[in-house]
A protein has these predicted regions:
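Cytochrome P450 catalytic-core helices
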Residues: 6-31, 142-160
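Cytochrome P450 I-helix active-site segment
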Residues: 16-66, 73, 80-89, 105-111, ...
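Cytochrome P450 proximal C-terminal region
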Residues: 33-41, 138, 143-198
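Flexible loop/turn segments at secondary-structure boundaries
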Residues: 69, 77, 98-100, 118-119, ...
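Conserved cytochrome P450 K-helix/beta-meander segment immediately N-terminal to the heme-binding cysteine loop
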Residues: 92-121, 197
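Extracellular trypsin-like serine protease catalytic domains
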Residues: 129-132
Length: 198
């Protein structure tokens, strides 16, 4: 997320998912109204923005910006009967792992609430959630990316609601990052709660 394209993709898929799940969007707005009371969010608010963090975690579970991660084998290794020789390129895919029913209940559903019982750290330690990669080559900007993502969502959602343009086609375009093939046109609406405070 720390790079501009990964951040843009994470936010794009987050707004798309929120536009399709009004109950989650309402819960996000309720948290922001309670914690922020109309003001601009600050870093000190992040510990209280638990559902906002859960929305971001769940969006990156379903649509990880880095959908495939490659590693070159240094030493011969047996992967359950498949022997990888030095120099072999191994690809892991957060996109595939994050949708695996062996590890996730209702894996194709957008359920930010799942992060109320499973922490990002726990899922990362179990190697079932890795939108930032893993091991010693894990994304150096991960901490910044979480801060940036949570604050972006909170800043926009405290005032605005986004809805998908009626004719918007949704199709994945997995290149280096996972982006929407036809862009993501959305309509922006001022939230009633914000208008009443203004």
């Amino acid at each position: 997320l720390a790079g501009h394209e990964t951040t843009a993709n994470a936010m794009t898929w987050t707004w798309y998912l929120l536009s399709q799940h009004p109950a989650a969007e309402a819960k996000l707005h309720a948290e922001l109204d309670s914690v922020l009371d109309g003001r601009v969010p600050a870093i000190g608010d992040i510990p209280q923005l638990k559902f906002t963090e859960a929305v971001l975690a769940e969006a990156m579970r379903l649509y990880p910006p880095a959908w495939a991660i490659g590693r070159n084998v240094v030493d011969e290794h047996d992967f359950g009967g498949f022997v990888a020789k030095p120099g072999t390129l191994i690809l892991t895919s957060p996109f595939v792992m994050h949708r695996d029913a062996r590890f996730w209940e209702a894996p194709l559903e957008f359920r930010p609430e799942r992060w109320e019982t499973t922490s990002v750290k726990e899922a990362t330690n179990r190697n079932i959630y890795f939108p930032f990669g893993g091991g010693i080559r894990r994304c150096i900007g991960e901490s910044f990316a979480w801060t940036e993502g949570i604050l972006l969502i909170a800043t926009i959602a405290r005032k605005w609601k986004l809805s998908l343009a009626p004719d918007q086609r949704i199709c994945l375009n997995p290149q280096i990052t996972l982006r929407p093939k036809f862009g993501m046109r959305m309509k922006i609406h001022a939230r009633k709660a914000w208008i009443e405070k203004a």
